A protein has these predicted regions:
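Classical Sec-dependent N-terminal signal peptides that target proteins to the secretory pathway
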Residues: 2-20
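Outer-membrane beta-barrel initiation region
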Residues: 20-83, 87
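Flexible, glycine-rich linker and terminal segments associated
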Residues: 21-37, 144-190, 197, 203-243
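Residues that define the transmembrane beta-barrel architecture of outer-membrane proteins
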Residues: 42, 54-60, 84-91, 104, ...
Length: 243
């Protein structure tokens, strides 16, 4: 299991990064990753996301409990995504606590994003509340890096922003959820990037597969509305159902 996950990380990462410029970073990353995987990761997803008019995004995300009790959990979450010849590493920690009456779960988290190719960096703080039928999530994003020269020598800068999302379980379908998200980013020197995102997600029982389809509506902004589709494989669920 450990070797399989590490191999997937290696394939995704090496396929699109410059060996000459990032060899030291890759060596350090995979050395740390292998040491971290000495304790088993049970909850790891591989995803393929396709957006209308854009190249697909491929990613791997893993969730590891660090301290798990009946009433709370502290966890590490890490992911690596590649899209349009750009690789982004995301690392963070969070804590979730079960309410005294066990009717809802609430939590806080903090993450760090690093786009490896052009050295863009940002931090985020998030909060969540979940019950058996509803959930509310919000994230606030803060730029760390300054303006950089990106792909095709275009000047790029990380944007500050936030999003807030509400989700609901579909009646009589335990693995189905519906989401509505509002997002807004402050684009330096340009129009704000804002809009609404509508999506639905369903898990296929006993397969480890989740399907998500959604639509981004940018309102009257200069951005084009777009559909997106996401397919996710959960490694632990696949293994548990085939063993």
């Amino acid at each position: 299991m450990k070797k399989y996950i590490i191999t997937l990380f290696t394939i995704i990462f090496i396929s699109a990064v410059s060996v000459a410029e990032t060899s030291e970073l890759k060596d350090n990353f995979f050395h740390s990753l292998e040491n971290f995987f000495d304790s088993k990761f049970d909850d790891t997803d591989i995803s393929i996301k396709s957006k209308e008019g854009n190249k697909p995004e491929i990613g791997i995300k893993t969730f590891k409990p660090l301290n798990d009790t009946e009433s709370e959990i502290t966890f590490f979450q890490g992911s690596l995504f590649t899209h349009d010849e750009r690789e982004t590493l995301n690392l963070g920690f969070g804590k979730r606590i079960l309410s005294d009456d066990e009717s809802f779960l609430y939590g806080l988290n903090a993450f760090y994003d690093h786009e490896l190719d052009y050295d863009h960096q940002r931090a985020s703080l998030g909060a969540e509340i979940k019950s058996s039928i509803l959930e509310l999530n919000t994230n606030h994003y803060f730029a760390i890096s300054n303006e950089k020269t990106g792909k095709n020598n275009i000047k790029e800068e990380v944007a500050d922003g936030y999003d807030i999302e509400i989700g609901a379980h579909a009646p009589y379908i335990p693995t189905a959820k519906f989401y509505t998200k509002y997002f807004e980013y402050d684009i330096p020197g340009g129009s704000d990037f804002e809009g609404l995102e509508y999506s639905s997600k369903i898990g296929i029982p006993n397969t480890g597969l989740d399907f998500e389809v959604g639509y981004k509506d940018y309102g009257n902004n200069s951005y084009e509305d777009q559909w997106f589709f996401n397919l996710t494989f959960n490694i632990n669920k696949m293994n548990s159902n085939t063993s």
